[in-house]
A protein has these predicted regions:
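Catalytic loop of short-chain dehydrogenase/reductase
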Residues: 265-266, 282-283, 320-351, 356-357, ...
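Conserved NAD(P)H cofactor-binding loop of Rossmann-fold oxidoreductase domains
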Residues: 252-259
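A short, exposed helix-loop element centered on a Lys and neighboring polar residues
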Residues: 303-304, 357
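Conserved glycine-rich cofactor-binding loop
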Residues: 180
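C-terminal helical subdomain
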Residues: 372, 380, 384-425
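Substrate-binding pocket helix/loop in short-chain dehydrogenase/reductase
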Residues: 260-272, 278-289
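Rossmann-fold cofactor-recognition segment
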Residues: 217-231
């Protein structure tokens, strides 16, 4: 078992040394091979299995290698097998691997049948050895295979090769956009426990202190800063101050009101007059607008102001915990299919999901991973009318930090989120009808 190392501050770059450009591993994949990436994005190892003859397929293909059937659904695999050969690449024609040489790779014969090529930990066991193959996302966001020793725990962040496939917060500088919520405060504590080097915590009005903010501010390596995602000037101020230092951004800011369409008396912008049913009433801002202003436009403001700085710094050094690696969006399982009792909140999160997919596409060439978190109902005042099970703030924070360590792209914490995801995959239209019943 590798012993976790203490978080260390990255060395200051010398001005006379070359600045590394963002380099990625080979990106091209066939459409069939993207199935491996889709599973790896969820932290799962899947291979194609023929529905007619049962043969497990590798590499991914359009027709069965044994019976030529085209019915090849992706199926979860245990990944157990035997490392039968290994080698170390000292010189590669690919610029990414040339910078990171030497690089260990090996040949694994799975118990399920196929023989495949996998990355090996730099300090892993030599062949022959029992291993467990897992699917991970590489720096380019594509699925790759890694063979871990069966009876040894490898800390990915402490391994020179596997560090490229994780977004572990150890030694990193993290921005949590909203520290006034229970989720934000739980995240700050877990990030510090995971070894984060610095945590900036956003808060709203200085005169309105929420419970827990004082305790959070007193923690070591924590700095509070004013951040209002509805105010472009506030976001620009934060971007100008720390945007060039953020390694991981976790957007926890959200507005949630349990309303459908008919429950709103208007959709006026801030300070306007909302008219409904022949009556008018002054409103500072209505609930639906507030949800969109934070959940969607707040994310857009962050992406436009801090995103470019993270992309430009993402190259870092090939050998160390430096440079931006991840952007985390706290969404909702309601983003997949609208939940009418929380209809406008669902719509705002669906808009944020679509925007985050655009952000992911723009961040991917720089190697910054965009992670979307889809929790079920959270145990707070805005979901108190919903029956259990609900997700606690600590459980959600643990899922976020776990997603960073595992390097996945999408995570669905909680029983409700897992059940809705399964039903949505089976038939989105049926789920829509079930939720509206």
């Amino acid at each position: 078992m590798t012993s976790p190392k203490r978080p260390t501050r990255p060395k200051r770059k010398q001005a006379m040394l070359i600045t590394h450009l963002p380099r990625l591993p080979p990106v091209m994949r066939s459409r069939a091979a993207l199935g491996l990436t889709a599973a790896a994005a969820l932290g799962r190892f899947q291979l194609q299995v023929c529905s007619d003859c049962g043969a497990v397929q590798y590499p991914p293909r359009e027709s069965c290698r044994r019976c030529l059937s085209d019915r090849l659904p992706w199926t979860d695999q245990s990944g157990t097998g035997e490392l039968i050969a290994e080698t170390t690449v000292h010189l590669s024609q690919d610029a990414y691997f040339r910078e990171r040489a030497p690089w260990r790779v090996g040949m694994v014969r799975l118990d399920a049948g196929p023989t495949l090529i996998a990355h090996l930990p730099a300090a892993g066991a030599a062949a022959p050895a029992r291993v467990r193959v897992a699917a991970k996302l590489d720096k380019s966001g594509q699925g790759v295979l890694v063979a871990f020793p069966s009876h040894e725990v490898i800390t990915m962040t402490d391994d020179r090769q596997l560090r490229e496939m994780t977004c572990d917060p150890k030694g990193r500088k993290v921005l949590v956009t909203d520290g006034e919520t229970a989720v934000g405060q739980a995240l700050v504590r877990l990030l510090l426990a995971a070894g984060a080097g610095q945590v900036w915590v956003g808060h709203g009005k200085s005169w309105k202190k929420s419970p827990g903010c004082v305790e959070i501010a007193a923690l070591p390596r924590v700095a509070m800063l004013p951040l209002d995602l509805t105010d472009s000037k506030s976001v620009k101020s934060v971007a100008g101050g720390i945007g060039g230092q953020v390694d991981i951004l976790i957007n926890t800011a959200e507005v949630h009101r349990p309303h459908g369409v008919a429950a709103h008396s208007g959709t006026s912008a801030r300070g306007g007059i909302a008219t409904h049913g022949g009556t008018s009433a002054r409103r500072g801002i209505d609930d639906a607008w507030a949800e969109m202003d934070i959940n969607y436009f707040g994310l857009l403001r962050l992406a436009q102001e801090i995103g470019p700085a993270m992309k430009s710094r993402a190259a870092g050094a090939p050998d160390g915990p430096t440079g931006p690696i991840a952007w985390v969006n706290l969404l909702s399982i309601y983003a997949l299919s609208n939940f009418p009792p929380h209809g406008t909140f669902s719509a705002s999160k669906a808009a944020a999901l679509s925007l985050s997919q655009c952000l992911r596409a723009e961040m991917r060439p720089s190697g910054v991973r965009v992670i979307n978190v889809f929790p079920g109902p959270i145990d707070d005042e805005w979901s108190e009318a919903l029956p259990p099970p609900k997700l606690t703030a600590d459980a959600l924070a643990k899922a976020v930090v776990g997603a960073l360590k595992d390097g996945v792209e999408d995570v669905y914490p909680g029983d409700v989120a897992q059940e809705w995801l399964l039903r949505w995959r089976e038939n989105p239209k049926i789920l829509e009808r079930e939720l509206s019943a």
